[in-house]
Amino acid sequence: MSCLPALDKFLQNYHQAYLTSLGELPRYYPQGEPSVCIQGEFHADLDQAVSWQPVKREVEGSFANVEHALELTLWPEINHFYGQYFSAPLLFDSKWGTGELLQVWNEDDFTCLQQNLIGHLMMKKKLKQPPTWFIGLLDEGDKMLTINNSDGSVWIELPGEIPTQQLSPSLAEFIGALSPRIAPPVKHEELPMPALEHPGIFASFKRMWQNLFGKR
């Protein structure tokens, strides 16, 4: 079952929750990065939050280059989850705790996602662990949410370790179990690492990537 209907519904509920509770669209700190998601004026030189809404991509994002580089077939849901929309990260509440689903802010962000996905999968191979790919963070970034690439199930994963706790048999069921979390925008700190320049995804990964790559 594709995760796209569940993602479509969550995005609709997400924005409706903000409109109902706050009377406004969700806001996000783009940190100078443009996006078709931005509603209203945008000034790259101003450090301010912008209102945003998801925009469906005209052409689906593809991970064929990642598959070719790693000689690995990725679970097809990766194209539905990351390739359909431009969007800010999506905050959620769940029975497993609070967290966020990662999304792609613009094309540069998508390129960074691919680069860091390659890094993650290479690390898994180096550690002789089964391949996974990340979809989000749980508990303020202390835990990764990852997909088992062999069957599409959703797991909690700590950097450098094999996932031990399965949350859902599929990404569609996992997204369907989430509720939008209403919160003010938070400005993330920039990391002093070139691969993490784009805030749409990788500011959210600051603790994870420091743990994963900072000690090599």
Swiss-Prot record:
GO cellular component, one term: cytoplasmic side of plasma membrane
Transmembrane residue ranges: none
Intracellular or extracellular location(s): Cell inner membrane
Gene3D superfamilies: Syd protein
Membrane topology annotation: Peripheral membrane protein
UniProtKB keywords: Cell inner membrane, Cell membrane, Membrane
Principal location: membrane
Domain of life: Bacteria
UniProt cross-references to Pfam families, sorted A to Z: Syd
InterPro entries assigned to the protein according to its UniProt record, in alphabetical order: Syd, Syd_sf
Function: Interacts with the SecY protein in vivo. May bind preferentially to an uncomplexed state of SecY, thus functioning either as a chelating agent for excess SecY in the cell or as a regulatory factor that negatively controls the translocase function.
Recorded family membership: Belongs to the Syd family.
HAMAP family found in the cross-reference section: Syd
Protein name: Protein Syd
